[in-house]
Design a protein with these regions (language model features):
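HIT superfamily nucleotide-processing domains
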Residues: 1-114
Length: 114
């Protein structure tokens, strides 16, 4: 639904942030920095986004299939002033994409990190 939405997945099977090794935490910090710098360069503004990590429930049960991941949901659509808003048909029916995920990913990949 969000044109520049990003899903981050650990390469190795990890279920929680504390389960990451030191080098894995460093790699996560690096990719978070690289992604947010590219977001900021996309429209040359501090790029707004909502981000969250998904970890297993903490109810004491085992969740061996759970895989740590994070979602970024940036609301900007085509420029620094055009935002994507969820409206009735997207909330209650079929999501609409103004930009394909492939073209959004290509635009982010083409941006310099620095």
């Amino acid at each position: 639904v969000w044109p520049f939405e990003t899903l981050l997945l650990a390469r190795a099977h990890r279920d929680t942030l504390p389960a990451l090794s030191g080098p894995e935490r460093d790699a996560l910090a690096d990719i978070l920095g690289r992604l947010t710098r590219r977001y900021n360069r996309l429209f040359d503004v501090p790029f707004p986004y909502s981000m969250g990590f998904h970890q297993p429930p903490t109810d004491g049960a085992a969740y061996p299939a759970w895989h740590l991941h994070a979602h970024f949901y940036p609301p900007l659509l085509r420029s620094a002033t055009v935002r994507k808003f969820m409206v009735g048909y997207e909330l209650l029916g079929q999501p609409q994409r103004d930009i394909t995920p492939e073209s959004a990913a290509a635009r982010l990949r083409e941006l310099p990190e620095e």
